[in-house]
């Protein structure tokens, strides 16, 4: 594939390895920040986003097939399509899911919080999307299953188990270029084909000691409904699902709805946010009573 590729190495050691690989793939590389540095300075979010947008402008200007920013450890990447549009992590995962399942039928793995669109893409292509627990480690453990063709933590980490069970940005770049060459399509074309769903998220405070009560309340409320307990409680509704899941590190609950209808997603998030708030409120007087006695 004689593709033109814009690569921002973020001054990481990847710059010492990837150019040779891409030359062997007959790619023309426009390198950015390619001088490896011992210490890579962290950027605040607004500076980083501006940095990515700049990469998008360059990608479009030089008519490259793809632009990729790779983090310093070489694990995660941010992808820009040929129009210069920065793909969100969800969009990048969706596009890569389409490429992976078009090439080989199997399973794609991602956190239970991943959008409904992934199940729809997998179904269209004769594959399966299988949810995992939300942490990156859980995604990698599940990726060891022999049928897995792609796994992602939803945060720019992509794992191709036929190569290695780890998040590897170098291999991701090489594999995506290979799949684009074989399919004859573009990232922008695939992005435009991502199913339109509404994905809403809310976060509610929940003391550690009340987290179990929230889970019990959810289970009691949905005893006869179709649920998935991979992480938290996911309740399936007519046009999607709502997930109530505890944060493993903070006293919080995530309420996430993914549906075809935008209004329905908003209503589900509000309904289940209110449920978490009410359980927390009911528990507070009881906790005070225990302290007083």
Annotate the PLM regions.
Residues 1-183:
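Phosphate-binding chemistry for phosphorylated carbohydrates and sugar-nucleotides
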Residues 65-66, 104-293:
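Phosphate-binding and adjacent anionic-ligand microenvironments
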């Amino acid at each position: 594939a004689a593709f033109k590729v814009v690569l921002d190495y973020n001054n990481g050691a990847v710059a010492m390895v990837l150019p040779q690989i891409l030359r062997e793939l007959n790619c023309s590389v426009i390198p950015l920040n390619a001088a490896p540095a011992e210490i890579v300075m962290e950027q605040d979010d607004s500076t980083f986003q501006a940095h990515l947008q700049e990469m998008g402008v360059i990608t479009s200007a030089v008519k490259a097939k793809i632009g990729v920013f790779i983090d310093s450890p070489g694990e995660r990447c941010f992808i820009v399509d040929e129009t210069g549009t920065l793909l969100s992590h969800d969009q990048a995962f969706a596009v890569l899911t389409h490429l992976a399942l078009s090439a080989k039928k199997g399973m794609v793995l991602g956190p239970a919080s991943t959008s409904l669109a992934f199940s729809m893409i997998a179904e269209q292509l004769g594959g399966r999307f299988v949810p995992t627990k939300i942490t990156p480690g859980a995604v990698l453990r599940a990726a060891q299953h022999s049928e897995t063709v792609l796994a992602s933590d939803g945060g720019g980490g992509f794992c191709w188990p036929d190569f290695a069970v780890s998040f590897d940005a170098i291999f991701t770049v090489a594999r995506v270029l290979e799949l684009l060459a074989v399919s004859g399509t573009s990232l922008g074309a695939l992005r435009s084909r991502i199913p339109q769903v509404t994905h809403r998220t809310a976060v509610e405070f929940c003391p550690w000691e009340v987290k179990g009560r929230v889970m019990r309340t959810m289970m009691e409320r949905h005893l006869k409904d179709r649920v998935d307990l991979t992480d938290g409680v996911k309740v399936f509704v007519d046009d999607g699902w709502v997930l109530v899941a505890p944060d493993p590190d903070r006293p919080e609950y995530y309420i996430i709805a993914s549906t075809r209808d935008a209004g329905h997603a908003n209503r589900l998030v509000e309904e289940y946010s209110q449920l978490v708030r009410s359980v927390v409120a009911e528990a507070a007087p009881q906790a005070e009573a225990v302290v007083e006695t």
